[in-house]
UniProtKB/Swiss-Prot annotation:
Keywords: FAD, Flavoprotein, Glycoprotein, Oxidoreductase, Signal. This is FAD-linked oxidoreductase tazL. It comes from Aspergillus terreus (strain NIH 2624 / FGSC A1156). Residues 63-235 form the FAD-binding PCMH-type domain. Induction: Expression is positively regulated by the azaterrilone A cluster-specific transcription factor tazR. FAD-linked oxidoreductase; part of the gene cluster that mediates the biosynthesis of azaterrilone A and other azaphilones, a class of fungal metabolites characterized by a highly oxygenated pyrano-quinone bicyclic core and exhibiting a broad range of bioactivities. The first step of the pathway begins with the non-reducing polyketide synthase tazA that assembles one acetyl-CoA starter unit, five malonyl-CoA units, and catalyzes a series of Claisen condensations, methylation, PT-mediated cyclization, and finally releases the first hexaketide precursor through the R-domain. PROSITE patterns: FAD_PCMH (PS51387). It is an enzyme of class 1 (oxidoreductase). The gene is tazL. Glycans are attached at residues 29, 41, 53, 91, 253, 318, 387. Its EC number is 1.-.-.-. InterPro entries: BBE (IPR012951), FAD-bd_PCMH (IPR016166), FAD-bd_PCMH-like_sf (IPR036318), FAD-bd_PCMH_sub2 (IPR016169), FAD-linked_Oxase-like_C (IPR016164), FAD-linked_Oxidoreductase (IPR050416), Oxid_FAD_bind_N (IPR006094).
């Protein structure tokens, strides 16, 4: 999920864990199969029940979504263990849901599955003596950010406050503060997870280190994480961040890309930046924008802000906020809107290590013409910029799987539209635009960040060609039947 421009019918009765009543989904009595072995605080829910959409996690995007015959909300690690072992016994497909933000084509292959909704796992422990934060998969970034800020601490986080912390972590976790302490996986110190066989294991540098390596970037393929512990850091500038946002006419987009290119190696580690250009179907006009965060003083941020002011924004604002409140307040105060669930959207993306002004201008011009011819389409060209000093400073043995540590930018094609009847058309033009961006990305072939992936890129792109042989070996060891990771699967051969 990105910063603001910024998966059956059943009876209408919720079955408790102790219930033995006949509740059915897709011709299978899931309450009978699972109900007897769950803890008292676990529950079983069926699509079609009046409160299903409010008692279970709903997906952020309905594009390429999985379908579920039943949702089970475990309350303990042993519940997750029991669900996996029981599903294996009855040959039932299952999928774990944390925040519901995953959006790749592979999820559409999951049909009538058992949804393991992890929203009960609210563990949230700040240990200042050990300098760690331990969270469960029921927590978004916002669940712990305020506590960290109040303690004078920080941890790398993603761009949107509503995204699941562990879900973002297992894909690497890019974000506005990664210039200071690296990716979210770089702060990860251990996980507890339930494997495909239903075993509960710990993975860290000391225990199951090969599994821990794989979890950091390919975690969705190896189990269901029920707890994760992170190292935390002292927050600079008393934890306060300068947020500066700028709105411009669409004609300024080229000047924004030129500015981005000019910053090059001088781009500071304290800064996060998102630039975008879009077209309004309502007004028939284009617009562009920039959102800058600086983890430091106003004085230190001002030279960068001044360069954006020199482009004569039609609207702008400058505020100093606790780092824990920046995401919610982005988008001129509309940051929460990016978290709305149930929209139909996808986001092909490209990792880049250089800025091509002419390509960005040309791609945006083509995008505008595409949107003008398709009144059902709302799209934006989004560029997120990062300082790579901290990500590249991580020792090779500690890096995990993520192959994009040298990405200075992620370029995203955001597509919102009204449903699957347009999928083929959107894929066709998105693939063409993506290819143009790849050609001047500074890489010889398509690179991307797995949490922004479309799903067609393949495992060499998601995980890195050099990492794949070791990953395949570990996949065979820990998940030999391919139970996990349908969104971005690691092959077994």
């Amino acid at each position: 999920m990105r910063s603001n421009t910024v998966i059956l019918a059943a009876l209408p009765l919720v079955a408790s864990a102790a219930s033995t009543s006949g509740n059915w989904g897709g011709g299978v009595n899931y309450s009978k199969i699972f109900g007897g072995g769950l803890s008292a605080n676990a529950s079983i829910h069926y699509p079609g029940q009046p409160d299903y959409n409010t008692t279970t996690v709903q997906r952020w995007s309905t594009w390429a979504e999985p379908t579920f015959a039943v949702t089970i909300k475990p309350a303990t690690d042993e519940d997750v263990q029991y669900i996996i072992r029981t599903a294996n016994k009855y040959n039932l497909t299952f999928l774990a849901t944390g925040g519901g933000h995953g959006g790749e084509t592979g999820f559409a292959t999951v049909k009538h599955a058992v949804n393991i909704d992890l929203s009960n796992f609210k563990e949230n422990v700040l240990d200042l003596e050990a300098n760690t934060l331990t969270v469960g998969p029921g927590n978004s970034f916002s669940a712990f950010e305020t506590n960290l800020y109040n303690a004078g601490k920080m941890v790398p986080v993603g761009n949107a406050f509503c995204v699941n912390m562990i879900g973002a972590t297992i894909g690497a976790g890019v974000g506005p503060y990664q210039g200071l302490h690296g990716l979210v996986i770089d702060a990860l110190r251990s996980v507890r997870l339930v494997t495909a066989s239903g075993d509960i294991v710990t993975a860290s540098d000391e225990e199951n280190p090969d599994l821990f390596w794989a979890v950091r970037g390919a975690g969705a393929n190896f189990g269901i994480i029920t707890s994760a512990t992170y190292e935390i850091f002292d927050a600079p500038n008393n934890g306060n961040v300068v947020l500066a946002e700028f709105a411009y006419p669409g004609s300024v987009n080229g000047s924004l890309w030129q500015l981005l290119e000019s910053w090059g190696e001088t781009y500071p580690k304290e800064m996060g930046l998102t630039m975008s250009a879009s077209y309004s179907q309502t007004t028939g006009t284009t617009s562009s924008s920039a959102s800058l965060t600086y983890f430091g003083t106003q004085e230190a941020a001002q030279p960068w802000i001044d360069q954006l002011l020199a482009l004569n924004p039609t609207q702008w604002r400058n505020a100093t906020l606790p780092w824990s409140e920046v995401s919610q307040n982005s988008g001129f105060g509309t940051g929460a809107s990016v978290c709305a669930t149930g929209k139909y959207n996808n986001h092909p993306s490209v990792g880049a290590k250089q800025t091509s002004v002419s390509t960005y201008i040309e791609v945006f011009n083509q995008y505008v013409e595409i949107m003008k011819a398709r009144p059902w389409l709302t799209s934006a060209l989004v560029v997120q910029r990062f300082n790579t000093t901290a990500t590249l400073a991580v020792p090779e043995s500690k890096r995990g799987v993520y192959p994009g540590r040298d990405f200075s930018s992620l370029i995203i094609l955001e597509n919102y539209y009204d449903g699957p009847r347009h999928d083929a058309d959107v894929y066709r033009f998105s693939k063409k635009l993506r290819s143009q961006l790849v050609a001047t990305s500074g890489f010889d072939s398509l690179q991307t960040y797995i949490n922004y992936a479309h799903g067609d890129e393949g495992p060499e792109v998601w995980y890195g060609k050099d990492n794949l042989p070791r990953l395949v070996q570990l996949k065979r060891q820990w998940d030999p039947e391919g139970k996990f990771g349908p969104g971005n699967p690691i092959p077994l051969a």
